[in-house]
Amino acid sequence: MNSVPNDLQTWKRFVKDGVLDEARLRKRIAESWHRCKKAEVNPYLEKGPKVLQQTELDQQSKKHSFFLTTAKPYLEKLLPAIKEMEMMALLIDSDGVVLALDGHPRALYEAKRINFVEGACWTETAVGTNAIGTALHISEPVAIQGSEHYSIASHLWNCSAAPIHHEDGSLAGVIDISCPAAGAHPHMLGIATAIAYAAERELAAKSREKELELISRFGERAASSVPMVLCNTKQHIISASMPIRTSMPDWQGRHLYELKERGYSIENAVTIGDGGTCFYLSEQKKKKAFRFNGVIGQSGRSQAMLMHLERAAATDASVCLSGETGTGKEVAARALHENSERRHGPFVAVNCGAIPSDLIESELFGYAEGAFTGAKRNGYKGAFQKANQGTLFLDEIGEISHSMQVALLRVLQERKITPIGGTKEIPVDIRVIAATHCDLRELAENGKIREDLFYRLHVYPIELPPLRDRTEDIPDLFEYYKQKNHWPGDLPSDFCNVLKQWKWPGNIRELFNVFERLSIRFPDGRLRDESLPALLEAAGLPASSAEKKPAAAGVLTFREQIQKDMMIKALESAKGNVSQAAKISGIPRSTFYKRLKKFNLSAES
């Protein structure tokens, strides 16, 4: 145990000075070190800080018993070879807790010295970069050697870990092979990966067996006229009665919450067998259709945004709308208000970025009579009072000062305001919708927005996609503009294709400006009679806009384009549910996530 890692100096410079020579470190390790530093993990830990008591470990083992009983035999088969190579093998659950370990006595002895034992929590946030915690975080096999570990507790160890997934792509746990650094073996990672793959197949087979047994127990209920479903432990539907099969043909594998979205409520729940639950349902009256006084296109991004708006409108939670200038944040905020229980109350919009800092306080909180020279005789009601029993929309929330953030936080916490110059607190009953063209989380991380205020406002974030990411909606937007302005315009296909290629930095607002120019220039709407250059000139677009916009990150191969198109269709079919989309695509969820990042897609794509 006295080997000295080659890159110890790299580690020392990073933990002491925050300087990292990334050329000397693998990308995955560098990313993990940055995560650890951000999470304030102690790099000088000499042993694992958290080990469960036996009763807690028993509870944890029971919670993950299906994973443990399925994967442990593979660990036991591996042991003779592991012991011969003076290593140890471990099974870790999805929470990062060591459930089982065995191996060579010397390895076990050294492991005990750093609390690397059953019941230890070995996540990145607990002990820094390590094969187990990093594999859990990135959901990929990984090997960590010597001082690549973030905490010194593991600097004299070499570890290789591979994640084990359930059939739906969710993480079941990790298998790890570790040894003192001096006894490293070149095939450690390969062995761990092979065992993880075998355990995954066994988990999938046993899950299917378990589900078949549950379906058998569900029995005649499947032919019943009473709406009911059989769900597994993750509340995915594995069998259903006739009313559900009829109303939801794609019921298999769907999540229980999707039935709630379709108007069903749970009347009763009965346990069936090991891990099965039969939910008896009743169909609720259809709710009023969601009204949106704008236009929602048919693209996946637009439909996903509408779904999130509809969900948020049904609650009274604070909503944070984010999107570039011109994406329609105020229109979305009004839609939330008009479809909520507060729709009969006032909707008050305040642009925090347009009000001088010395006036924002009186604009929001109002002032009492005689509060200052020039004050109105009877005082002034601020936005919070005006919005009482309704909705207050705070646009460009990232522009308010820190002192105003403190005052705003207090109102959000206590639901009371005190006007400037006033002495009495006034209760207010409001819903707050905030909006920003920036990333609010990034503003909080950079200290521009207080973290406590961020968590108050960022309860249900909704991103409004830029027009360049949903150009297939342009024909719908054109039709909306025509109807709203009573203009009989037509949209030539070649001109529409050029509009789809434009980058639209001003988003929908810029697009509508183009439509307005065209309606003024061609009041009869006969755009098809005009040449493409004439239309571009009338629209105020440069002739070069007919050229294709540059690819964001390089040209995709034919195969990659097919993969991307399939993923978009799967996400649309699954309504943004990544696990379901991965299942539809027939690929593991971890791979699906990697491709989301690769193709710059989001769950709302």
Curated annotation (Swiss-Prot):
- Origin species, per record, is Bacillus subtilis (strain 168)
The record's Pfam families line, in alphabetical order, gives: GAF (PF01590), HTH_8 (PF02954), Sigma54_activat (PF00158)
Q: Which UniProt keywords apply?
A: Activator, ATP-binding, DNA-binding, Nucleotide-binding, Transcription, Transcription regulation, Two-component regulatory system
Q: Name the InterPro entries on file.
A: AAA+_ATPase, GAF, GAF-like_dom_sf, Homeodomain-like_sf, HTH_Fis, P-loop_NTPase, Sigma_54_int, Sigma_54_int_dom_CS
Q: Please provide, alphabetically and separated by semicolons, the GO molecular function terms listed in this UniProt record.
A: ATP binding; ATP hydrolysis activity; cis-regulatory region sequence-specific DNA binding; DNA-binding transcription activator activity
Which GO BP annotation is one of this protein's? positive regulation of DNA-templated transcription
Indicate which residues the UniProt annotation says bind ATP: 323-330, 387-396
Function, please?
Acts as a transcriptional activator of the acoABCL operon encoding the acetoin dehydrogenase complex.
UniProt-recorded name of the protein: Acetoin dehydrogenase operon transcriptional activator AcoR
Recorded GO cellular component terms are: protein-DNA complex
Taxonomy of the source species: Bacteria, Bacillati, Bacillota, Bacilli, Bacillales
Q: Specify the Sigma-54 factor interaction domain's residue ranges.
A: 295-520
Induction, as annotated: Negatively controlled by CcpA, a global regulator of carbon catabolite repression.
DNA-binding region(s) in UniProt: 578-597
SUPFAM superfamilies hit by this protein: GAF domain-like, Homeodomain-like, P-loop containing nucleoside triphosphate hydrolases
